[in-house]
Structure formats: C-alpha cells, structure tokens
Amino acid sequence: MGWTAVLLLCCTLPAQGLIRIPLQRFSSVRTELRSAELLESFLRDHQPDVFARKYSQCFPPRLHTLRLGWTSEKLYNYMDAQYYGEIGLGTPQQNFTVVFDTGSADLWIPSSYCVSEACTRHRKFKAFKSSTYTQVGKVISIQYGTGHMLGIMAKDVLKVGDLVVTDQEFGESVYEPGFTFVLGQFDGILGLGYPSLAEEVDSPVFDTLMAQKKVTQPIFSFYLSRKKSSANPEGELLLGGVDEALYTGPIHWVPVTQKNFWQIKIDSIKVQGTSTFCTTGCQAIVDTGTSLIGGPTGDIILLQQLIGASPTSMGEFVVDCVRVTSLPQITFTLNGVKYPLPPESYVRKEVISGQEICFSGFQAMEMSSRQGPLWILGDVFISEFYTVFDRGQDRVGFAPARQTGEWGS
C-alpha cells in the first residue's frame, strides 16, 4: 500500500497504536532572562536579528558564519521555545529533554566533554557508557551571535517515545556560549524539518523513522495547550498519525511551497475582519521551536498599534491586561480557510515582581522569500490549532484545538 492510500486511511483511524511523546510547558529563556534582570543586556547585544538568525540558512538578511576548516552551521535561536519532551540515546539509555523543532532538522545534545557553563546545568551524553556509540569523525561549528558552539558528530541508538532506531546521527556539543543555553530548560534540539534543511545529519530523525519503517504513516502532529491542567496534557507530539480527541472539526490542508522549512502560503491576514496584511499573499514558516508569531517590521508595528500595544524599553510590546478580552480578533486565511486568533491566544501573561504583565505575541523580523514577505507561525498559532505535518503529501494541516474544559464534548 502506498503512502497516499495509507494517509487517506489514517485520517479515519483512532489514535491507538500511534506513538505519543508528552510535551511539558516551561518558562522560556526570555522569561528566565527577564526574571534574572538580564533581558535588556541580552537584547541590546543581539537585536535586531534574534529571529533572523534562526532562518538565515534559507533567508539570509546578512551572513552569520564562522568557518574553522570544518563544517559550519548557524545556531538557531530558541529563547522563546516553551514546550519540551524526552528522548533517549545510547545503550543503556541516557535521557535528555529536547525542543521538538519543525524549524530545524539536526539533532544535538551536550557532550560529557563540554565544560561551558551551559553544559554544567544540563544533562550530558556520556559516549563512553554506550556500547552502541560510533563516532563519525566530523567536527562541527555552530555560530551564535558573537560566540560559537563546537561539537562532534556521532551515531547511536535513539529512542523517541516507544520507537527505537539504530545509527541515528547527532551532534555532541563540547562548547556552548551565551545565556540561551545557560537558562534554557532543555538539553538539546531535535529537528523535524526537511532533510534539505539539515547541515550536519545525513538523515534527520523523522527520516530515519520512515526509512526504518518505525511509523505506519509519514506524518506527525502537535497539540500545544494554552492552559495548564493536571488532568490533560500540556502538549503532545504524535508520530505516525493524529489524535481526533485533541481537535474539533475536519483537518484543512495547506500545500508546502518550499521543502526545507515547513513553508506555506498565507492568503491574507485580517484584523477584526478588515484586510490589513498580505493582501496579495505572503509566505509563512510553521515553527514549533518558537512561541511567537513573527512578521515584517512595518506590518508588525502597525499590528501592535491596531491591538493597542505599547513598546517597552526592551523592544517588546505590552497591552493593558484589563483590556485583553476586548482586543480584536486576528484572522489568518490559509488555502481559503479562515483561522481566527482570539486575544487570549496572542497575548502572553507573565507575573513580574508580583504584577501581571500582558505581552503581545507578535514580533518583528526582516526576511522575505522568493514568493513574498515571510511570517513565522509559532506556538501562539499552533496552540490554537492542532497542527499536522505530512511528509507523504508535503502539506500542513490545521484544525481547532480542544482547550482545557472542552474534553469529552
């Protein structure tokens, strides 16, 4: 049976037999920097390109590359990542917390030989304890701001959920710079982008799962809850299918326009029903590795004005928490289907020094694609819509996500 036939069948099958990876929601690095009173200095040193740095491989506004005679790669920016899950590497298994990131395609974790401050605060892979470990012999350099990460490539047994694959290539970092990894509550990154996005691994993790026939269908899906509940998952990555209990209505599909990031076309973006942005269409990357929605600077500044957001000294935008429920709805139209974002989705509430502050979930970035202006649809969008990534038919699907309190309805 071909992938197409299997995919048609999968949309009507229950979720039994599929592989679930629970995702936990933690404070982002941005929040940790703010709590440590370090955010202002970090943004001063790294703005305006904290967003651009992640996507510079395919959409370079400027080049951030360090070459040391070995393979060179850009280090992705994860200061807004919030949802993490567990994987296991080696024999016997060593566990790590990772960002499952559709905006990258490589897998890396800290090495036991790493002595950077960031590594001392995270679990480190002990290669000498794994009987199935193989060193590839390639040194990697990953650029980040004014510093760089160094590492080596290796292969070992990888466990994701209940799935086990052999000879998965991954990077072991031996030097990690910057506050992003010191304060991050994740050990490493597991990329779920297309193979063309990977600069280091020959076969990204999901490609290995498909090649070794570990998933019945070439799809994976994300559920990210906006609300914490002891009875229901904060988030879930499902490998090989979808879980109908986590969304309502049908899944609507949007074709991938460029196979590296999960890039799709936006028809339009409207604020309270008025067509304001992308009136002639634009492009978007669906990215589980950031919590924000990013867009062109001019559009984002206008959007902040339309929702009544005011700038802070650190380049962020805040709204009056009392007014959140009266803020306008923002609607993204994708492949003819409207996806409305209520203010409860695009406003992030944080308590700082005992005071509740409401931050806008939109952030400016300066990049474009050959097909038009570029937006980033991060967790602000994905938490509102159950999101399915289909490698078999190169498309992304969306359906309204069930929120806490809607279960069993």
Regions found by a protein language model. Give the residues of each.
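Short strand-coil-strand connectors
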Residues: G88-Q94, G145, K159-T166, P218, ...
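Extended, H/D-rich, highly charged conserved domains that either
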Residues: Y194, K214-G240
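Aspartic protease catalytic domain
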Residues: G2-A36, E40-D45, P92, F100, ...
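Flexible, small-/acidic-enriched active-site or ligand-binding loops
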Residues: N232-G281
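Aspartic protease
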Residues: S112-V164, L302-Y339, P343
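Disordered propeptide/prodomain
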Residues: M1-V98, D106-I109, Y113-L150, A211, ...
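Aspartyl protease active-site motif detector
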Residues: Y83-F128, L158, I189-G193, L239, ...
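Short, solvent-exposed loop/turn segments enriched in Ser/Thr/Gly
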Residues: G151-K155, F186, T279
